[in-house]
Structure formats: structure tokens, C-alpha cells
Amino acid sequence: MTINFESQVVLVTGGTRGLGREFSLCLGASGATVAVNSTTSDDAGVIDTITGSGGQAAHFAALVERPDSLIEAVVERFGRLDAIIHNAGFVRDKTLRKMTDEQWQEVIDVHLSAAFKLTREAWPHFEAAGGGRIVFISSASGLYGNFGQSNYAAAKMGMYGLARSISMEGGRSNITCNCVAPVGATTMNSGHWSDRDKEIRKAEYVAPLVAYLAHSSCEESGSFFETSAGSYKKLRWERTEGLNLFPADSPVTIDTIAENWQTITNFELTEHPQSMADSLQRMYVRFDD
């Protein structure tokens, strides 16, 4: 199997530096027409690198927080849009107690709100193209939390709820949406890493997974992946079988919860709900007997 992006136009936000640069280069080398976005007019040599190897690419300077003109410019230039990789973003790290409203909102806007707005603006163009692929670049901070990053963690985990909803709404139109939490060595994050760590965590190693999720042949949707150092893993929800009572027969009190805490939190027996309906059905099934 050879994955080729010929005739597919892919927009990469934040596509000139760090991980975004690797996404752009990987796509360009695989035949995609790459719409490379950044906030400034400096494309950091990405366009020349892609076109110098025979690929097609153009740079679009725009703020992703206001994406209507960006999407319009890409479609006007290339005639279509097939996929978006939303990678643009920044951090404003502070402990929650010291974080300002502005520091909170800036991070929410560039990561989560922009993901929503980009998707909304691109939707009719995806439908016109017969489908679309959306990849949100999330973070392990969203999955696990991180000290001093309550804004960033909330935005990055919010992307997953958004992706799940998009995957449901987009199913009939062949529009998919997934999240990836990558870790790769970039100038921004690797200053304190050893040379060995930088070598095994090269940013280019995470790009193939992201690119595949953006390809028209990939039907995966509503999923969350982690990748670093050549590892590629899909996540799923897991919960305990927990405590399942019949409150109508025996009232449940705060003491009931406290006395059964080990049962509620014991992961020896688990469930893996796939949707809200599945989650609730597993809670209600015992009443069907």
C-alpha cells in the first residue's frame, strides 16, 4: 500500500515551525497540496522545501482565531479543501491562582475556539469535495493535566469532546475528526532534553500518523491517539463496574457511598463505553431483568 495525497488539499495551521513544519513537509512529500498557515509572513523556508522537491504548497498568513478569510483564501487559491490539521497554538503558563482572565481566554481561543471555527467555516467546502478530514493536535496535558497549565489542559481536552461531536455530525457527509497528542523534540520544548532524548523523540516521527488521519482513505473518526518516539497508540475510555444499587428498594445515603468507596473505585472489573447511549445503557441494563 502506498498512501498518496495527489489532488488533495490539506491546510496545516501553525505549519511553519515545530511539529507543524514536520506535518507540512510529510504531506508535501506525499503528494498533497499543502496550505501552510502561520501568523506572520515568514514561512521559515517550508514552501521552498516542498516545492523544491516537486511538491505543491503555498503560505497563508492569518490568525486562526478568525479563520473565515483563511479558509476562503485557501479555497480561492486551490479550488477545494480536503483536510485540516489544526496545530497552531501557544501556552500562557501560570498556576490557576495567578492566571488572569486574559491568559485563560487567549489559550482557549487559539486552541479550542479556533478548532470549532475552522471546522464550521470548512464544512460546506468539505461537503462540496465529497468529504473532509480534520485532525486536532491535542496534548498529553489535556489527557493527564499539567502543573501551571489549567488553561492549556482544558483547551486540549475540550478538543476531544468537539472531535467526538464532529464525528457524529459529519458521518453522513464523510467528514471525520480525530485528536492526536504528540510529543516530539522542537525548539520550544526540548531545551532541557538530553541529546539522546532529542534523537529518539524527533518531531518527524509523529508526522506519519497525523498525515494518515488526514488522508481521504482513512475512515477512523472520533478517536484519540498518542504518539512519540515511534510509538503510535489509540486511547479509549475505561471505567469501573462500580457500585450498582436499587435506590427505590433501599435508599442510598452519603454513608452508602463512603462505605462502598473501594467498590466504586476498583479497576479489577472494567467497562469500555463507546458512546453516551452505551454509557447510560450499561447503568440501566440491570433494571431490564
Label each residue range with its predicted role:
Residues S139:
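Residue(s) in the substrate-gating loop at a strand-loop-helix junction
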Residues T16-R17:
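Conserved glycine-rich cofactor-binding loop
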Residues S30-G45:
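Conserved glycine-rich Rossmann-like NAD(P)H-binding loop of the short-chain dehydrogenase/reductase
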Residues D197-D288:
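C-terminal helical subdomain
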